[in-house]
């Protein structure tokens, strides 16, 4: 197995693990829980998810052609707890992850790490569905 294939498999598995952990955590929370904070200096789950999503969108959009932080990102706005429901929280969460996952679906990235189309198809299916 080529090193590019091994590397991508490890990266994909790690991202899947992090997303699954987040999914399971959010699933256990009530509508009220997503806004709970320990004190005025801490952030709610809603704010943390909003910030993580904003970070993923900023960092993974045009990942190979532009540098990290994008000019259109309003990072300070991510720390305002204005998510109105758990379903909205999930839409924000999924939006960030979709940008990250779509990055791994680009033919250019596939060619950079030297994956065959057959190997990539298998990897892509596991990334999307598991």
Descriptions of predicted regions:
Residues 121-130:
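Individual transmembrane alpha-helices with interfacial aromatic-anchor signatures
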Residues 45:
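Helix-turn-helix
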Residues 1-10, 55-120:
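Short, helix-capping/interhelical loops that line the mouth of catalytic, cofactor-
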Residues 15, 19, 26, 93, ...:
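Hydrophobic alpha-helical core bundles mediating ligand binding, dimerization, or RNAP-core interactions
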Residues 39-41, 119-122:
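A short beta-turn/loop motif at secondary-structure boundaries
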Residues 51:
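Histidine-centered divalent metal-coordination motifs
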Residues 31-34:
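Short, solvent-exposed secondary-structure junction/capping segments
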């Amino acid at each position: 197995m080529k090193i590019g294939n091994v590397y991508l498999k490890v990266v994909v598995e790690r991202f899947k693990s992090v997303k699954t952990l987040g999914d399971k955590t959010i699933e256990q929370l009530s509508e009220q829980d997503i806004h709970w904070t320990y004190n005025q200096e801490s952030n709610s789950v809603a704010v943390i998810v909003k910030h993580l999503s904003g970070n993923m969108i900023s960092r993974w959009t045009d990942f190979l052609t532009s540098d990290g932080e994008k000019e259109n990102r309003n990072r300070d706005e991510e720390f305002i707890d204005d998510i109105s429901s758990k379903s909205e929280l999930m839409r924000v969460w999924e939006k960030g992850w979709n940008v990250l996952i779509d990055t791994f679906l680009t033919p250019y990235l596939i060619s950079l790490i030297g994956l065959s189309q057959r190997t990539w198809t298998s990897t892509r299916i596991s990334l999307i569905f598991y």
